[in-house]
């Protein structure tokens, strides 16, 4: 398991996860989807994958996990865990994940 980054944002875990999914879909290089079997009542787990398309073929490479925990008062704590892939393009994929994390941080209101 890789580096962990934690911060708190406004909104419930469900609202924030939907916003992250939509943002990732619009960005195009990564997907971020809720993984129901790794989630529970208070915490949602999201898989972040790189997407590479070649004609009809689509390759997904796991880059990391986002855990969204209800912090009360319509706030959510995000824990973002990098999981560097065992892949020939590891450095490039790590850079894609790091860029996505920075964009998520800057896009969502980070609370102290």
PLM region spans:
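Terminal, regulation- and interaction-focused segments at domain boundaries
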Residues: 1-36
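Short beta-strand micro-motifs in enzyme catalytic cores
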Residues: 3-5, 42-44, 76
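Hydrophobic transmembrane signal anchors and adjacent membrane-proximal interface regions, especially
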Residues: 30-33, 46-48, 58, 110
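Beta-strand/loop substructures that line and gate deep hydrophobic ligand-binding cavities in soluble
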Residues: 53-112
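A short, structured loop/turn motif at beta-sheet edges
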Residues: 10-13, 37-40, 68-76
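Glycine-rich, flexible loop segments associated with nucleotide phosphate handling
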Residues: 34, 38, 60-63
């Amino acid at each position: 398991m890789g580096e962990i980054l934690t911060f708190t944002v406004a909104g419930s875990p469900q609202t924030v996860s939907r916003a992250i999914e939509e943002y990732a879909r619009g960005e195009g290089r990564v997907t971020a989807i809720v993984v129901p079997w790794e989630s529970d009542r208070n915490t949602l787990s999201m898989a972040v994958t790189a997407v590479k398309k070649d004609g009809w073929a689509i390759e997904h490479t796991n880059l990391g996990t986002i855990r969204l925990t209800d912090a009360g008062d319509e706030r959510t704590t995000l824990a973002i865990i990098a999981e560097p892939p065992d892949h020939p393009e590891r450095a490039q994929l790590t850079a894609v994940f790091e860029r996505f994390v920075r964009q998520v941080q800057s896009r969502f209101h980070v609370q102290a």
